[in-house]
Amino acid sequence: AMLKEGMFIQDRYEIISKIGSGGMADVYKAKDHTLNRFVAVKVLKPEFRKDKGFITKFRVEAQSAAGLAHPNIVNVYDVGEDNGISFIVMELVEGITLKEYIEKKGRLAVREATSIAIQVSMGLQAAHNNGIVHRDVKPQNIIISTDGKVKVTDFGIARVATSNTISSNVMGSVHYSSPEQARGGYSDYKSDIYSLGITMYEMLTGHVPFDGDTTVAIALKHLQEEIQSPRKYVPELPKSTVQIIYKCTQKSPDRRYSDMEELISDL
């Protein structure tokens, strides 16, 4: 059943309005009547509600993310099921995605892009220190709140993509996915570093480095093509900034930053 305004989940969360929709879930603004605050409730779409394996993964991911409390992460408060509806309750962040912000501004100044990259890195560092790899870092999954805080959202959801969501989901992400992910191989925190490098490229130039007509064409570019200098678009970019992007986006994970801490200190 569709969730409607005024409906309650677990007699606690009152649905106020739908605020977003992704490949596998809808997101609603809700009122938590126990703690008297507004929250975001993410609900698995009806077409996935019968898929036991999917529901289990949805819950495992939510629980792993729930252990993370960090100012640069959209925090997860609760996870559960009510009348066959699997849901995750999260911090409600008023703001826009980094993708929308880049589209609005065309491209970002070096100082601002660097500040955003540092905040994203700090959120990811907290996750990595807890053994959680995001696997889907992209401007669509980074929120800039109305008070200027930068928060990473949708943790580990990339890990739960089963065959039936790949088609709907991967297209948005393939521009940012690492060569090892494009190959369908093993991915770890070094993949997050790569995706953040691509995100930085887009922040600074307004373009993604690899584009094409199909998912496969773009994936092949991640595997085979050298990244073009961001100075092609913005000639005055500092050399140090360009070097950071190059180091994040090395084809071989071993040649990237060893961890977020090393990247943060360079930024």
Residue locations for each model-derived region?
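AlphaC helix of the eukaryotic protein kinase fold
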Residues: 45-67
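Conserved short submotifs of the Hanks-type protein kinase catalytic core
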Residues: 83-97, 101
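Protein kinase catalytic-loop region centered on the HRD/HxD motif
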Residues: 120-132
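C-terminal lobe helix-coil module of Hanks-type protein kinase domains
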Residues: 175-267
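Protein kinase glycine-rich loop
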Residues: 15-22, 27
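Activation segment signature within eukaryotic-like protein kinase domains
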Residues: 116-117
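Activation-segment/catalytic-loop signature of the eukaryotic protein kinase fold
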Residues: 79
